[in-house]
Amino acid sequence: MSGILIYTKAEAERNQFAVHKFLQNLDIKLVDETYMGNADFVINRTNDYKIAQYFEEQGIRVFNPSELSRLANDKQKCYEFMMEHNIEIMPINYTGIPVVKKKIDGHGGTEVMMLNHTEAFEDNYVYQKPCDTPGKDLRVWLIGRKIITAILRESKTDFRSNFCLGGSAIPYQLNDNEICLIKKIAGLVESDYIGIDFIFNNGRLVFNEIEDTVGARMVYDKTDIDIIGLYCDYIKSELEL
């Protein structure tokens, strides 16, 4: 079986290490988001659920599923989904100040702002109550709904703790309650390889977002886990290769 690995050209350039790991471990070729040819399986590393949907409609196995990508890339829908399933989030449609303003489909913390004034709600943004512990969050990596590792990210200079924005990162030992919460969230959505991000409020984890094209830089920098290798092993197992 031969598959395709889909990245936009810009993201393929930015993620050369990950691309190399995929190509090294699987019989696949790298293509961009315009590819509409044949494949036995697809690894979708774009944030566009329609790409996954296109191949799914042809009966082709896609990692991750389109419905997961659709949910992960619409923060408003994702928060509403979590609330429906009794997963704690920070309140949305928040009218107080300060307020966190997030682009619905934003990534990497680059379109997240802390406002100290009120404004009319803009389309394509989520307005959310800030947590009581800014500049600190937790990312958990899962493969096939199994927890692989967790890393705590902190920033002393910014309410955003993203590693790519200069925050620090250290491995984190999950407690039993945290593991239970993560497993509950993982059980709500079909997924293959994701990150789940949490913020801290009142001393406990609060759901923040799902990353369907989760990066691996922190895992390789801070642990000895070959997470892309593990993901490739999972793909082989799923395809019975």
What role is predicted for each listed range?
Residues I4-L5, E56-G59, F63-L138, G144, ...:
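Active-site nucleotide/adenylate-binding loops and adjacent lid/helix of ATP-dependent enzymes
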Residues N116-H117, F121-V189, F200, L205-F207, ...:
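ATP-dependent carboxylate/phosphate-activation module, predominantly the ATP-grasp catalytic core
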Residues N47-Y49, I104-G106, T213:
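Short glycine-rich anion-binding loops that position phosphate/pyrophosphate groups of nucleotides
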Residues K236-L241:
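Generic C-terminal helix-cap and adjacent flexible tail
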Residues I51-A52, G109, R204:
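Glycine/Thr-rich phosphate-binding loops of Rossmann-like dinucleotide-binding domains
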